[in-house]
């Protein structure tokens, strides 16, 4: 048991931030994300001796995703937040973005973070999920296919559509500003 625990701590726990990030983007709630990650980590630890794939990160994120889907099935459809930014508190802005010695840079970074959160929050769950896994967590297409239990071609098409949709939301939110995408 001690060897398994040590292996789990060395191989799975370094991906705790990625697990939380995915849960946060799926649930749009800090509290729900924490609950999902707690459930997922318990399940992951109980089944860690069966983990055979090359990527512990992808395996753990698949468990997080499945824990989220199980939670949705148990509690039924959740009320959607009309404005994802309203649902987010100041804790959602990374401290590094708001703590430099340059207040102007801090304001621009905080505004960019809000725009990013808003654009991602407006994407359908399937698009948001693959975009977060690829662009924020750095998973390969194959790993994303494993996490989402979808064919790699579906991952690629969802990712392409997610990028288009994200860009459209980003440009609408930043119309007239100098920091939009080109």
Residue spans of the language-model regions?
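Arg/Lys-rich amphipathic alpha helix in sigma70-family domain 2
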Residues: 62-84, 109, 168, 172
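A short pre-motif secondary-structure segment
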Residues: 130-134
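Conserved RNAP core-binding helix
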Residues: 30-47, 152
